[in-house]
UniProtKB/Swiss-Prot annotation:
Keywords: Ribonucleoprotein, Ribosomal protein. CDD domains: Ribosomal_L30. GO terms for biological process: translation. GO terms for cellular component: cytosolic large ribosomal subunit. Part of the 50S ribosomal subunit. Belongs to the universal ribosomal protein uL30 family. InterPro entries: Ribo_uL30_ferredoxin-like_sf (IPR036919), Ribosomal_uL30_bac-type (IPR005996), Ribosomal_uL30_ferredoxin-like (IPR016082). The gene is rpmD. It comes from Chlorobium limicola (strain DSM 245 / NBRC 103803 / 6330). This is Large ribosomal subunit protein uL30. One of its GO terms (molecular function) is structural constituent of ribosome.
Length: 61
């Protein structure tokens, strides 16, 4: 696996989103707009980001 770290920033609210998208945001450790987390980059995490790509911004560190 890679040693890259990525920063995930929630930029939009989950109001009006599906249950799957809300659960994914919670699993990522986010909850409200402007919350951010730093996690190790891996394929599983990239899949979660793809589900909520319209709600988050991703930066590679």
């Amino acid at each position: 696996m890679s040693d890259k770290t990525i920063r995930i920033i929630q930029v939009r609210s989950v109001i009006g989103c599906t249950k799957k998208q809300k659960a994914t945001i919670k699993a990522l450790g986010l909850g409200r707009p402007n919350y951010q987390v730093e996690k190790q980059d891996n394929p599983c995490l990239r899949g979660q980001i793809r589900v909520v790509q319209h709600l988050v911004k991703v930066e590679e560190l």
